[in-house]
Design a protein with these regions (language model features):
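Alpha/beta enzyme core
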Residues: 1-210, 214-234, 241, 247-251, ...
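Flexible C-terminal active-site loop/helix
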Residues: 256-302
């Protein structure tokens, strides 16, 4: 899914059309975010309302539309205890994901940057990731290919039990030792912590999550690679752009415009192509019944 050649840009996606557009533009991987699914599928904030069924239903469509592009699924806090974590890993693999991200928030979880976010104890965090790795190994034993992305939100936690860089580093080291394929922590405070993280973690791959949030500097993939990262996640960029675009079109319609200005719209032919009509027509033509009207199977001797 990831290579060691530079830093892979991993956009966040929340529906099948977004996955299709990313794949058409030759992105190498994507991340289906719980934040995006909760917003687009439920119309709700990311406060634990998108359950396992909602996520795997959305994920099945996203992974199908993504084609050969690997997609990491946001497994949140595993939707319960360790048995739920195991079930989540197996369900995400069955849905077509290449990997699942499991974090150490309490359940039900919420957006890492929201008020009142808390993490579980060290012991519970370790048990959760151990259960995820065990389920991954079960998949691999059956010939499947799957990865575990282990995340800690301890750097941003508000409960006093994990709101520090050193606590986040302890958890990342533990997740690494348990066999997670990728580890990362939310909310690094500047490049000094980013560089220190990569100096202390030895997993094959590390990831940085970036959010377009006031007061936070966004780094380019090249800058991330120079700090030691293998992937940079932009989980909310496409959702944020979509909300802005839809709101602009809505405002234009509210002003009495029956037709929204072209500057806000995708040209019809381009929309037609992006959704895949031409591919569908080519498939219908390739297997047109008219081509088989005179078909007869060859005689078979006994």
């Amino acid at each position: 899914m990831l290579s060691k050649d530079g830093c892979e840009l991993m956009p966040g996606v929340y529906d099948a059309l977004g996955a299709r557009l990313l794949a058409a533009n030759d992105f190498q991987c994507a991340f289906m975010s719980g934040y995006g699914v909760a917003a687009s599928r439920l119309g709700d904030p990311d406060v634990g309302l998108a359950d396992l069924t909602a996520m795997t239903d959305a994920g099945t469509a996203v992974c199908r539309a993504a084609g050969a592009m690997p997609v990491v699924g946001d497994g949140d806090a595993g939707f319960g205890g360790v048995a739920n974590v195991r079930r989540t890993v197996l369900a995400y693999h069955a849905a077509g994901f290449a990997a699942v991200s499991i974090e150490d928030q309490i359940f039900p979880k919420r957006c890492a940057f929201s008020d009142g976010m808390q993490v579980v104890s060290r012991a519970e965090a370790v048990a959760r990731v151990a259960a995820a790795v065990d389920a991954r190994d079960e998949i691999r034993a059956r010939g499947g290919d799957f990865m575990i992305v282990a995340r800690t939100d301890a750097r941003l936690a508000s409960d006093g039990g994990g709101g520090a860089f050193e606590e986040a580093m302890w958890r990342c080291a533990a997740f690494e030792d348990l066999g997670a394929d990728v580890v990362y922590f939310e909310g690094p405070d500047g490049e000094r912590e980013m560089e220190a993280f990569n100096a202390r973690v030895a997993t094959p791959f590390t990831m940085l999550a970036q959010v377009e949030k006031p007061g936070r500097k966004l780094l380019t993939p090249t800058e991330c690679a120079n700090l030691g990262y293998d992937a940079v996640l932009h989980g909310l960029t496409l959702l944020s752009a979509s909300v802005r675009g839809v709101n602009a079109a809505i405002e234009a319609m509210k002003e009495g415009n029956r037709a929204v200005g072209d500057e806000l719209l995708t040209p019809f032919d381009a929309l037609y192509e992006a959704i895949g009509f031409e591919e569908h027509y080519a498939l219908e033509e390739k297997f047109s019944p008219a081509k088989y009207a005179a078909y007869e199977p060859p005689p078979r001797g006994r």
